Amino acid sequence: MKIYDLSHTLDNDTPVYQGTPHPVFKKIASIENDGFRETYLSLTSHTGTHIDAPYHMIGKGKKLDQLPLEIFAGRAAVVHVPADEPIIRKRMILNGSVSLQDIDFLLFFTGWNKYWGSRKYFKNYPVLSPGALELILANNFKGVGFDTISADKEDSADWKIHNSILGKGMIIIENLNIPEGIPALGDFFCFPLLFNDADGSPVRAVLIT
């Protein structure tokens, strides 16, 4: 068994979406002064590698704390998108030998995570084509994951991809940190923090093969 960590490390310098407060990690106790260590955390529900709940964009969509735990685990196919390809196309999803009927999650490996921490990470990243989105909506997936800041373009006015996927009751995982050479198939886990009215949550996403 091998476990692949698909998560970015959180710290005070974690990149955030424009207009979003930066996370704060502050040491509030030390062994020298208090006999123990403790850290104060302040961050939004969509910081770092995280899940979008249907409630994030759908008025009556389910919150993370309303979803069964089973939705956060399942069989995943890693879809390799050619380097610097601006569009994730339907044929890229169908290119593998895995039957989509056996898949719970599609994880899109575009390589964009290499720009994590730079300004380029927020601009011109690959997004789904209309055909790829239609294929996803036609299947009964639990969720879809991206190694980019958002499923939609940075200047999207209607958040069509978000609204379409979340509107079907699926979850979206963003800011995945998918490593080179990862197998095309594995068991995916992305459990969120448990808190009330959760529109999203940071996760420790892993793929087990």
Q: For the regions a protein language model found, what residue spans apply to each?
A:
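Active-/binding-site microenvironments in catalytic and ligand-binding cores
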Residues: 1-209
